[in-house]
Structures are given as C-alpha cells and as structure tokens.
C-alpha cells in the first residue's frame, strides 16, 4: 500500500480509529442517558436512543445523533441535551480513554422519519400496482 494512500473515506465513514472511538462514545452516551445521570427533568421523562456518533478526523468533535422514543418532543430533548452538554462531555471523557475530551454536538437522527416516508410510499396503490405487474411478468 503506498504511503500516500489515505485510510478511510467519507464513503466508509472514516478511519477504523474514528469508527471505533465513535462506537465507544455512542455506548458511553447511551449508558449515561439510560441511567438518568444528567438529572434533568426534560430528559428524565424520555427514553432516548443514540443510533450513531460521528467523530471528526482529529477526534476532537463528536456529532451525536439522537432520537427520543416515539419521535416526540425532539426540540425539548435537544434543548435539554444542550443545557447538559458540559456534564455529558465530562462523563464521556471519564468513560472513554482519549487524549482530549471531544466537543459534543447533538443532532436529531432523521433516518427514522425517512424510512417511514419510504415505507408509506411503498404501500401506495401506484407502487403496489407496479410491484404486482413486475411479479406477474417474471
């Protein structure tokens, strides 16, 4: 492998180290939120899933994708996480062995909404008709 070959790419989601650290951070944040360690009333009433974390190449920024169960109150949950960002960053630093504690940025994971939209499209009469005609032809 040539020395100038870059490891990882945007298509693969980053280097192996980025992926490994992102998964470790994801587990840490999911544990913190499930244990209710933040002690915020806006967070305590919600079950929050953390489906993905993306790390910057220098591992100094973690973009954490979240989704409250049922997809409700995303704005309230996002605001509560922003208020507790300093605490969460400290907890992540304590649980994940890195040279620097990554800065944390929260985003709502919209893949669930997109999957639901596609599922609804697949159930429309026009698509069902096309699918059935394809089955009859084969």
From Swiss-Prot:
Domain of life: Bacteria
Family matches, as InterPro entries: KH_dom-like_a/b (IPR015946), RbfA (IPR000238), RbfA_dom_sf (IPR023799), Ribosome-bd_factorA_CS (IPR020053)
Record keywords: Cytoplasm, Ribosome biogenesis
GO terms, molecular function: ribosomal small subunit binding
BP GO terms, sorted: maturation of SSU-rRNA
Cited Pfam families: RBFA
Keyword Phosphoprotein among record annotations: no
Keyword Protein biosynthesis: no
Location relative to the cell: Cytoplasm
GO CC annotation: cytosol
Role description: One of several proteins that assist in the late maturation steps of the functional core of the 30S ribosomal subunit. Associates with free 30S ribosomal subunits (but not with 30S subunits that are part of 70S ribosomes or polysomes). Required for efficient processing of 16S rRNA. May interact with the 5'-terminal helix region of 16S rRNA.
Protein family per UniProt: Belongs to the RbfA family.
Stored HAMAP family: RbfA (MF_00003)
Subunit structure of this chain's protein: Monomer. Binds 30S ribosomal subunits, but not 50S ribosomal subunits or 70S ribosomes.
Protein name (Swiss-Prot/TrEMBL): Ribosome-binding factor A
Organism: Bradyrhizobium sp. (strain ORS 278)
């Amino acid at each position: 492998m040539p020395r100038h070959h870059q490891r990882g790419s945007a298509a693969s989601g980053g280097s192996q180290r980025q992926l490994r650290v992102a998964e470790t951070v994801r587990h840490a944040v999911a544990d913190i939120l499930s244990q209710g360690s933040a002690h915020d009333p806006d967070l305590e009433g919600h079950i929050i899933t953390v489906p993905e974390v993306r790390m910057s190449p220098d591992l100094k920024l973690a973009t954490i994708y979240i989704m409250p169960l049922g997809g409700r109150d995303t704005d309230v949950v996002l605001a509560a996480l922003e208020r507790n960002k300093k605490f969460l960053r400290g907890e992540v630093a304590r649980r994940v062995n890195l040279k620097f504690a990554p800065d944390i940025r929260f985003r709502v994971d919209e893949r669930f909404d997109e999957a639901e939209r596609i599922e609804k499209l697949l159930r429309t009469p026009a698509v069902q008709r096309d699918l059935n005609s394809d089955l009859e032809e084969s």
